[in-house]
Amino acid sequence: MKHLAIFAALLAPVVALAEPSPADWPAVTAEARGQTVYWNAWGGSTTTNDFIAWVGERVFEDYGVTLEHVKLTDTADAVTRVLSERQAGEDTDGAIDMIWINGSNFNAMKEADLLFGPYAEQLPNWAVVDVAGKTVQSDFTVPTEGYESPWAMAQVVFIHDTQDLPEPLGDMAAILEWSTANPGRFTYPQPPDFLGTTFLKQALVDLLDDPSILALPATDETYADVTAPLWQFLDALTPTLWRSGRAYPATGPAQLQLIADGEVDLAISFSPGEATAAIANNQLPQSARTFVLEGGTIGNASFVAIPYNSGSKAAAMVVANFLMSPEAQARAQDPTVLGYGTVLDMDAITPDERAVFDALELGVATLTPAQLGSVQAEPHPSWMTRIADDWMGRYGVAQ
């Protein structure tokens, strides 16, 4: 894991330079014209890549901003790059202008003072963000304080092939019971892939009688006792997994391919609309559907953040603001595009803009907001950093 320990040594102050102010938006858009934004974002999904390419087309049309998608397999790689530039004294015109980020990676960059801002709450489209109803001002319990801007809402769902697994499974105990009776028919991406670690934290939240302790940082005094139910569960589950737990798909799309190939019947997703989009793109069978656990599932927001040493901060803010626009949000929510949840307040946008959202059909495999039920809070990032490391020591295999 490329995470937190090395940040403690970073004590040198960042060079203070004149920065574009989002409070003067005409000046920001004027400065942004002609700039290029290198957006470091996960590149493991063709639908996501296509959406980012569309964003690039739109911001070039409207603002003269060029958007380059730098495809990542691990967001921590971008964090490490900014850190390396900081250590080398490269405090201007860094290689990265914007990062798709949340959780422990955001926490690490924020603590190490590697982010530009605060900017998010001064962007024009912040006025239509649903601050009251969505978790857009905290990230895995860490206050964002304007250092990242939201662009999508996500919630854990489980995708199942109803031909072989017709009924939803209500909790982790039911998943274990089913997997034991149907060995080889379930798997999850190998941590530290974000979906793999998502399965681990969802399991822990579901197994604990009182998961509220996960809102606090993990400590040496609490960690072993709190995570004991998870390891007991995984010790029983692992031998029942696809390939007896001796191999794992590397990514979420690779996991879905196993359903498409008929090798497994159950997968985890962090996008309620992913199954519908995959069916529309012939990446999942028509029999695929989704469910959530009876006690609810984890939900969070996806954010973008701007490194402190970006040379295109104005253009990066333009892209961040466009991502929060009703146009971009409606496209992202379209189940044939991404199927992501919106960060917007439907009462704050115009009737014409709302009509676009109202016209979207959820699709055959997408649950309604009522069916998605209660959203469980993300654990503090410190839990998942330790759990992912421990998982590698206990169950990790070479890819």
Summary of predicted features, one role per range:
Residues P22-R33, N40, S45-T66, F158:
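Short, polar/charged alpha-helical segment
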Residues W42-W54, V70-D77, T92-I96, W100-P253:
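Extracytoplasmic ligand-binding site segments that recognize negatively charged/polar headgroups
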Residues V82, M109, Q255-A260, I306:
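Hydrophobic residues within well-ordered alpha-helices
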